[in-house]
Amino acid sequence: MAENALPKGYEPRDVEERWRRHWEDNRTFTPDMDAPGEPYSIVIPPPNVTGALHIGHALNHVLIDVLCRNARQQGKKVLWLPGTDHAGIATQNVVERALAKEGLSRHDLGREAFIERVWQWKEEYGNRILNQIRMLGDSVDWTRERFTMDEGLSKAVRKVFVDLYNGGYIYRGNYIINWCNRCHTALADDEVDHMPEQGHLYHVRYDFEDGSGSVVIATTRPETIMADTGVCVHPEDERYAGLIGKKILVPVIGRAVPLFADTYVDREFGTGALKVTPCHDPNDWTLGERHGLAFIQCIDEDGNMTAEAGPYAGLTKEECRKRIVADLEASGQLVRVEELNHSVGHCYRCKTVVEPHMSEQWFVASTKLAPRARAAVPQMTQIFPESWMKTYFNWLDNIRDWCISRQIWWGHRIPAWTCGKCGKLIVSEQDPTACPDCGCTDLTQDPDVLDTWFSSALWPFSTMGWPDKTKDLATFYPTSVLVTGFDILFFWVARMMMLGMHFMDEVPFKHVYLHALVRDGEGRKMSKSTGNVIDPLAMIDKYGTDSLRFTLAAFAAMGRDIKLSEDRIEGYRHFVNKVWNAARFSLMNLPEEAPAALDLDNVKGMHHKWILHRLEELKASQAAGIDGYRFNEVAQGLYRFWWNEFCDWYLELIKPDMQAGGERQATAQYVLWTVLREALLLLHPFMPFVTAEVWQALPGHAGDDIATKLYPAARPGCRDVKDAEHMELVQATISAVRTIRAELNIAPSYRLTTLVRPASAEDAATLEEGREMLMTLARLDGLTVAVDVEAPKASASSVVAGNEVIVPLTGAVDFEAELARLDKELGKIEKDFVQVNKKLANESFVSKAPADVVAKERARAEELSDAKAKLEALQQRFRDAIGK
């Protein structure tokens, strides 16, 4: 028996902590830059410093870790680079809330003191998520940990901004932007969450200035009427033929504005006449520019009405809406109000309704950068699943310039200064001391900071030392693959593509794998309000990390959301225990030292040949599956091999070998040792902790670290399909006897006699070769394999690949007792069957009960019908056996 026997039960907490510490202390995952091997690199999607580990993070990190550990096994030079994002708006909001508890605001502190306070918060709490990530067993290189506001990354951000500005790719100008009244900052288009809301469509009468009539306009935002500077209709709309060019009066304030035509107008919406409010709608802004309209702002940055709102100045926009609707109704200009379901934009951070707002902002000319990013897919970068390519192309084809300035204090401050004397704008990597034109030293830096996604878009190369020409950049850029959620395809992936192509002249990653969402077991989105959130840390504490990891991988089918429930995680905890117990059994049957090597290509014993064949199939399918990002298929293949083939079959088959001694035992020990260690290597990327613990307990592996070992080499000589087919016939025959035993309620301890009428001479020889296995695992007292066997009247039979398996029942079954038992069971089933059918025959139940309840009853009826048919067939078999 091997000395390094494992404890009876697997305790994940102690094992995991020990291996985490071992890997980090020994810098196991820091790549040796001088070692041979193809580079393989992945940058972590940087979590927010404000964040806590959620199940989506866990999925993302498990999949990346599988890829990285697998790549190391292939002998590649692997870098998985970790880090965090400063998360401008989110972090500032957290610190502002903390200040509010002290009765302070950021303005009370001032900019410098507030930023210092944020840094203090970051140092105290910002590493929380990284410590939580450590719990997952991520094989990252912690020596290369980065933060988006590190000195080196900040240097890269400034250089990119200045280079883009000097190249005409960044500009400043007035435009309609998305404005959050709560966060007091601009938002990019993809930072706006559009949610359905129940609202109203107000039909308002606008009178012509000359008193000749009126036009009815439909709007969802009557509070912006005071900023109207035109009314637009479609040039081919016959309802307004002859009216184009007339002056029309804006209700309440009486401003005369033009009625003009533009093909932008949808003739089918509302009345076909559109109020144009350039300062409060991006499409109206475009119309205003195109037709030379005035630009008037009636809602300010706080969501209050400006002086331009006339009698409503000072009101909130919500109060203004109520007042103006009442006033329009009183004046007779409110024609009617309709209920309307429409999409309303909300801030992705605080969920406040977003206000279109005219403001001077900084923009990246994305329209200039997009073409190269588009052309790179799929020639240089492949997206998995391929279905997301169309979405990627559509977004880039319809891209708008990216608003990158944010009116907050925490973040990369825009490197632009204005001269107080001559007004010159100075954009510089270094802080200027004087104006280059007039020499004035009174320089004011732009107060805004850059959108968080701006620095994140540089992550693949800024983290490796760019703009310096570092060894990391030369070795690991472009990265091998990006694994991330589909929800940030536009926020992050496309922008990394644009800036990577522009500054590195190469794509940032060769592959992009977009995983789906993790939902609850019923397919619902997880949310705190629903109470269905699965906390990964709680699951790790309860079931161990390997259980959670394997569950997520096993359900990570490409392009399909994951339905996750705690019972599934618990189920894979049983799998971890199965691996542990299989290892314990193996160690009890292995010598203290590594067993003597054998030529496995010529090993004797069909069960040995079979398990080696299945192991070779697993190696090949796993390598192809991971390369194709089919994580679920690989995980399910591992599960089948370990649970069904290795544990349920092979370990049972070798028990007689281990008792036999001599060459037979030595052969079994070497095959067992080989299969166990190679199966551990295959399982390791998915379950790093339990495999590491078992590995170092194997004979010949004391002190070894499985994380540094290579993928098991292929053995072409063990891929003979015939060997596997022979064993599978023996297995199927054993299963057939076991099924008959279970169906007929024959005690497991009772040894049966079995007759087999073989389909061919080859099958007969195979069954004879497997006689000992058949006798042992099917618990037989006798076995006859012959073409002329006769089935006794009282017998049960089954056909396996053309071979008839016959089990005589006399003495094995008490027919009278079994018939009585079956009568009793059938009576209960028939009673339940009548009740269910009665319920389904009730039209009131079928029409009024919830659909899932009706479906459940129908499934129950089908289940009872099947059970009834099986019991009746069994009953008839017993009657035939005794001539009843």
Swiss-Prot record:
GO cellular component labels: cytosol
Coiled-coil positions: 812-884
The keyword tRNA processing is assigned to this record: no
Lineage: superkingdom: Bacteria
Residue ranges annotated as motif 'HIGH' region: 47-57
A biological process from GO: valyl-tRNA aminoacylation
UniProt catalytic activity: tRNA(Val) + L-valine + ATP = L-valyl-tRNA(Val) + AMP + diphosphate
EC identifiers of the protein: 6.1.1.9
Binding positions (ATP): 528
Motif ('KMSKS' region): 525-529
Locations listed in the record: Cytoplasm
Keyword Cell membrane in record: no
Principal subcellular localization: cytoplasm
InterPro entries: aa-tRNA-synth_I_CS (IPR001412), aa-tRNA-synth_Ia (IPR002300), Anticodon_Ia_Val (IPR033705), M/V/L/I-tRNA-synth_anticd-bd (IPR013155), Rossmann-like_a/b/a_fold (IPR014729), tRNA-bd_arm (IPR010978), tRNAsynth_Ia_anticodon-bd (IPR009080), Val-tRNA_synth_C_sf (IPR037118)
GO molecular function: aminoacyl-tRNA deacylase activity; ATP binding; valine-tRNA ligase activity
Enzyme class: ligase
Transmembrane residue ranges: none
Family annotation (SUPFAM superfamilies): Anticodon-binding domain of a subclass of class I aminoacyl-tRNA synthetases (SSF47323), Nucleotidylyl transferase (SSF52374), tRNA-binding arm (SSF46589), ValRS/IleRS/LeuRS editing domain (SSF50677)
Keywords from the UniProt entry: Aminoacyl-tRNA synthetase, ATP-binding, Coiled coil, Cytoplasm, Ligase, Nucleotide-binding, Protein biosynthesis
Role summary: Catalyzes the attachment of valine to tRNA(Val). As ValRS can inadvertently accommodate and process structurally similar amino acids such as threonine, to avoid such errors, it has a 'posttransfer' editing activity that hydrolyzes mischarged Thr-tRNA(Val) in a tRNA-dependent manner.
Known partners and oligomeric status: Monomer.
UniProt note: domains: ValRS has two distinct active sites: one for aminoacylation and one for editing. The misactivated threonine is translocated from the active site to the editing site.
Family from the record: Belongs to the class-I aminoacyl-tRNA synthetase family. ValS type 1 subfamily.
Protein name in the entry: Valine--tRNA ligase
